[in-house]
Amino acid sequence: MREIVHLQTGQCGNQIGAKFWEVVSDEHGIERDGLYKGNNDLQLERISVYYNEIGASKYVPRAVLVDLEPGTMDSVRSGPLGSLFRPDNFVFGQSGAGNNWAKGHYTEGAELVDSVLDVVRKEAEGCDCLQGFQITHSLGGGTGAGMGTLLISKIREEYPDRMMCTYSVVPSPKVSDTVVEPYNATLSVHQLVENSDETFCIDNEALYDICFRTLKLSTPTYGDLNHLVSIVMSGITTCLRFPGQLNSDLRKLAVNMVPFPRLHFFMTGFAPLTARGSAQYRAVTVPELTQQMFDAKNMMAASDPRHGRYLTVAAVFRGKVSMKEVEEQMQNVQNKNSAYFVEWIPNNVLTAQCDIPPRGLKMAVTFLGNSTAIQELFKRVSDQFTAMFKRKAFLHWYTQEGMDEMEFTEAESNMQDLVAEYQQYQDATVEEEGEYEDEVLEDEQ
């Protein structure tokens, strides 16, 4: 089967990753000790996508857990899923990266990277037909951002034809953990533009908003935020793990979603999002799902899709839904909001379907949008970067790890190019293409 090897790096990556394995194990009926206790053959049919079977109905996640300090790993190990993972797959250093991208990418992380790659190789060799890798990390810190991107480029070298898919937590405008986030994030995006096939952008602030507004939580914890992320991760891969009428895998997703290789940063969303207690009081319909999923308040990245246009969209419906109704509703959204979809990619909405809904819901949908509005997010980080960089603030932390200012300048201009590319395609219309063709014809005559 088409296996995916999962990596989680840094504190953020490990916390999201742990939550993801909770959700997936629950969906597949895997207990905390790795034993299968489910009640449905469909749970086992494609379980090998994420799990290795090592004995009579005992399953171990194809997961590699990486960090430069032991703290987060210890809490995963002593947490509810501690005994699920292979003990050899915990790879950690002792020194930490101290929120310094250069430490993660060039010094501390580079020392640990070979032992991580050994584990990755081992996992990849245990696969029948490896489809690709997914990595959870944040872009604002040292380990997830610096070492995460180092791992991505190393894996890219070794497995150039496999999909590389990242779930990246981008620094949010108001909630900041460290002052050097803009540096770390810009250096990371510089890497992701070149080395990732699909990057799902997630942002803590947008997640907080969803918790306050929609889920009515007065004091959301990181656990609540990570739960939202894990639902989306589970939704994106649901087609690989369960049967459905319209299945999609990482590569099909990329082919449909990425019109230009550099523009592979997606917004994600999920519907129905209802407050924990009120879910059982109402039935959800396909029109409601469709409407909620395109709602700006549902986006898990802090950029407003109404400020840009969608290049492409993918929707993964789960549960017993009528595909005819889904197609009608999706068409309906496009017709009513045609200004928000670029007209030079006809049929730019992909729909996939899977029969098994998430726990506790009759039907649900996961949304992926490649919208030019994501440039707002990059622009914001880029402006903060420039403000600090022109004063060379905090630079010594990076240069003393052996980095060159040149690399900062390159990362800065790459980020600005990315913003400009999104803007260019946001403004592009079919007419421009037409005018150009007329000129060519005149020249030929």
UniProtKB/Swiss-Prot annotation:
Pfam families: Tubulin, Tubulin_C. GO terms for biological process: microtubule-based process. Mg(2+) binds at E69. The keyword GTP-binding applies. GO terms for cellular component: cytoplasm; microtubule. Dimer of alpha and beta chains. A typical microtubule is a hollow water-filled tube with an outer diameter of 25 nm and an inner diameter of 15 nM. Alpha-beta heterodimers associate head-to-tail to form protofilaments running lengthwise along the microtubule wall with the beta-tubulin subunit facing the microtubule plus end conferring a structural polarity. Microtubules usually have 13 protofilaments but different protofilament numbers can be found in some organisms and specialized cells. Tubulin is the major constituent of microtubules, a cylinder consisting of laterally associated linear protofilaments composed of alpha- and beta-tubulin heterodimers. Microtubules grow by the addition of GTP-tubulin dimers to the microtubule end, where a stabilizing cap forms. Below the cap, tubulin dimers are in GDP-bound state, owing to GTPase activity of alpha-tubulin. Belongs to the tubulin family. This is Tubulin beta chain.
